[in-house]
């Protein structure tokens, strides 16, 4: 954690919706004139798309059916921890990009599925923003959660998460439902060991809960819409949270526990704006006072 160079992480599984949350942060940063450095968790994978395919096939041939990107072994978490440590101390650090598609390939002049070269973060940023799988992971060797000043978990109920992943991967990556199902099953042990425990470390969790039947996510024809959902917002430490204000500002919201508020799904962006803006500005105020 750092007063002069704060770090925000948004962590969630593949298909959880962390990219949408990132867009909300971008809106807040733009409105409040906060200059952020953005880092994606994909860029800290240990292997590129083609290396990973070969390794998965080799591991499967050995009988390992659970070789996945969710594991610390397939990610450069030591480099991510070093980035967090360096940024907290100096406001800089080394990062790279992972090139997802043809559009990014043109932007970074790198083949899709590959990494760009390592480079230094731009000087003079106010905040480091990380979005990915491992922002709050804690293992016997590493504690990434300790470096972040604000940790956000994006955690749809698991059937909804799977529906979102299946539809996204089919639409953008050309996968079949069977392909995505195999991926989900392969990742499950690492999901339980390394993804779920992070949501105990996060300061705020946003959990979307559908109000329609998602009993069999592998045959769902549509992703439940925000109007067909509620969102449970859970605070690790509810002290200082103005719940009466939130209840008055978000129509049809209610408290389900002393540290949790439930809102209509179509109010999630508004809730994030109301909740996160003061927290970000508090970090910026601390930064300014520290000189």
From Swiss-Prot:
It catalyses: D-ribulose 5-phosphate + ATP = D-ribulose 1,5-bisphosphate + ADP + H(+). It comes from Xanthobacter flavus. Homooctamer. ATP binds at residues 12-20. This is Phosphoribulokinase. One of its GO terms (molecular function) is ATP binding. NCBIfam families: PRK15453.1. Pathway: Carbohydrate biosynthesis; Calvin cycle. SUPFAM superfamilies: P-loop containing nucleoside triphosphate hydrolases (SSF52540). Belongs to the phosphoribulokinase family. The keyword ATP-binding applies. Keywords: ATP-binding, Calvin cycle, Kinase, Nucleotide-binding, Transferase. Its EC number is 2.7.1.19. One of its GO terms (biological process) is reductive pentose-phosphate cycle. It comes from the Bacteria. The gene is cbbP.
């Amino acid at each position: 954690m750092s007063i002069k160079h704060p770090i925000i992480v948004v962590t969630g599984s593949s298909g959880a919706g962390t990219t949408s949350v990132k867009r909300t942060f971008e809106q807040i940063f733009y409105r409040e004139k906060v200059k952020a450095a953005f880092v994606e968790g994909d860029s800290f994978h240990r292997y590129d798309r083609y290396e990973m395919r070969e390794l998965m096939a080799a591991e499967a041939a050995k009988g390992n059916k659970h070789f996945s990107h969710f594991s610390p072994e397939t990610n450069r978490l030591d480099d991510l921890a070093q980035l967090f440590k360096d940024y907290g101390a100096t406001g800089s650090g080394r990062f790279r990009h992972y090139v997802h598609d043809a559009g990014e390939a043109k932007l970074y002049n790198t083949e899709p599925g590959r990494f760009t070269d390592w480079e230094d973060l731009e000087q003079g940023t106010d905040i480091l923003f990380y979005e990915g799988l491992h922002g709050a992971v804690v293992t016997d060797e590493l504690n990434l959660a300790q470096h972040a000043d604000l940790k956000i978990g994006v955690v749809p109920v698991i059937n909804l998460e799977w529906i979102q992943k299946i539809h996204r991967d089919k639409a953008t990556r050309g996968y079949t439902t069977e392909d995505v199902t195999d991926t989900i099953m392969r990742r499950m042990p690492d999901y339980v060991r390394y993804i779920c425990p992070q949501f105990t470390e996060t300061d705020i969790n946003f959990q979307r809960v559908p109000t329609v039947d998602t009993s069999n996510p592998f045959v769902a024809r549509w992703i439940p819409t925000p109007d067909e959902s509620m969102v449970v917002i859970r605070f690790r430490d509810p002290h200082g949270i103005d719940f009466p204000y939130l209840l008055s500002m978000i129509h049809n919201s209610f408290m389900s526990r002393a540290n949790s508020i439930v809102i209509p799904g179509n109010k999630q962006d508004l809730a994030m704006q109301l909740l996160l803006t003061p927290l970000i500005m508090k970090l910026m105020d601390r930064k300014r006072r520290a000189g």
